[in-house]
Amino acid sequence: MAKLQWDEQGKRLYETGTSKGALNVRGAGKVVAWNGLTKVTESPEGAEETALYADNIKYLSLTSAENFKGTIEAYTYPDEFMAADGSAMIAPGVTIGQQTRKTFDLAYRTEVGNDEDGTDHGYKIHIIYNAKVAPSERAYETINDSPAAITFSWAFTTTPIQVEGFKPTSYFVFDSTKVPAATMKALEDMVYGTAEKEPKIPSPTEILELIKDITTTTTTTTTSTTTTTTTQSQG
């Protein structure tokens, strides 16, 4: 049995950065790059306990449903995002507000670093499904001796979608330090597109199909390890 070790070389991990935003507004029919994306804040809520008491003791606790929401910040946004922000273009360069807000999916990348490789250690691809943003404030100020660009900010909520074999969710994460390189490439080819294929945000069903080989390999390895251990014990 191994003794616990802390802060070993190569295991001092951290996460940073936000880049490579890919937006799919429902009904737009295409995925577009989100330039100027600066921050995605994930703020899940819910999963709150309701304690029930009986016979003068805590009998059990019920947990409320969890909701995935957050905030998106950027210096600019794709034209396609206007439909998600409640705007419509009625003529080239002319928009009106207070329209129906479309739902959207968003993929983005964050970096995984460690003490040896820095941010070259790995990365994560995050996919948010079925999101909708609320109206947000925009403050335009006069240009002065300390010029600054406006940072747009949108609070978003999500509605979970069905995932076979699991509870509904609106959030997936792929970690390149754990997912095989071939699977990560297949995912990125889907999300970012290739010379032959248009980009798309894969559905949960497509993701489950994509990772099928990983789960099969993991199950086989676990079973093999268990069998070997049992055989050695019996021997």
Regions found by a protein language model. Give the residues of each.
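Intrinsically disordered, low-complexity coil segments
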Residues: 20-28, 116-119, 163-167
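Oligomerization/assembly interface segments of phage tail-like spikes and tubes
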Residues: 42-44, 53-81, 146-161
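Extracellular mucin-like PTS domains
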Residues: 219-231
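Mixed-charge, glycine-accented linear interaction segment located at domain edges/termini
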Residues: 135-138, 142-218
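Hydrophobic membrane-targeting and insertion signals
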Residues: 2, 233-235
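Positively charged
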Residues: 48-49
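Polar/acidic, low-complexity leader/linker segments enriched in S/T/G and N/D
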Residues: 1-44
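Structured, beta-strand-rich domain cores
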Residues: 58-136
